[in-house]
């Protein structure tokens, strides 16, 4: 995150540097000050999520694009720099899938401005080799066209109304419209006062026309980064935002603030303007900067979402840092041990230690205990066919995979109901009115049916329908479902890899119904007869 802010300011400083040659100016942080003043920006800087990588990437791309937009008249473009920029732009889709909009636009600009076909080939190869190679690997190894997390979040469909709620939730506590409104006249004044040195104006040539020169220019790069921010914001509004306060709008905000990351306050010298005009310009810029600085001081100390910060309301949005600080009792939960104070976490270790023969752990209504489903063990000590009995296995079915994974060790399988680490849940349909980011929910009956667990009473909890378990077990025999699961569960061989590549589009689109009976009907399988509910005491 810090590297991203440094690169942001270096890029913006480079943007204004040519017009400051021979002039005295004071460089002041403006957009950078706005970004670091927003509390979610500071929270997610150390969250362990991809936020830091995103800022570093966007800052690097911004700085390199600014350098690319300022070719010297007397010096030809470096092919090494051109290839490096194309490589960085191509990596956009590897940082986050939706960043393909940013990296793709940068590559298009470079192709338009390229003077020769040799350079265009270089741009295509440097920008496309790694993303294409990794895409082939993803298709062959995972059998998917997109990351599994993108499948779980399911970009299909739109939730514009929820997205507007998310924007309002991010804007309201900090009045973010204030610095954005102040940044517009600030940027316009800086553009008006900007000197256009002749050494940055490449001569028109047959292979470098007006369109190419217009694309490879500072105004075009400013339009590129601002337009990218707008596109990213619209993308996330369409998606419905997120359940974490402010998280997915931080990257769009970063892009929108890039052209005014730092601003030069020119000292009047009477060269380009009269001293009186220069003083008016300095006064206007200083006034706008003071407004931004004042807002930043206020926003940095804002209470944020207030009383609703840790309560899951109808919007489904919470302040994640405060939520976990409150739930664990630690102001800054950092280590695995800190999260043992989260509800159910200490109890999971007790449950694992008390089940040496193996078990599936299901979250109960009591935060101090887990419901247990025993592992099926052959009574003779050997499996059918004379094979040795399988080793005891443990699995935990819960939403919060991170804190579980840190504390239960590598021998315990952690699976979730929303599909982030569970391929079966990831291929369910998105629930229309569910909490954003958690809008897939696999019933525990499927997990019991899919593993070596007891599937009858009294081995399963009373709230589990044994008939559903039986139906889910039958539904898992659907040929299409088995093919999808085998794509990630079967041993990886060359044949499996090539088969996954060929069927990745089909597997990515495949969805099952989370109600076992409906899934049997969808697949055209017979609905098995199952026992009724457990006897009441």
Residue ranges and their predicted role:
Residues 1-537:
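Membrane-proximal envelope and lipid/glycan-remodeling enzymes
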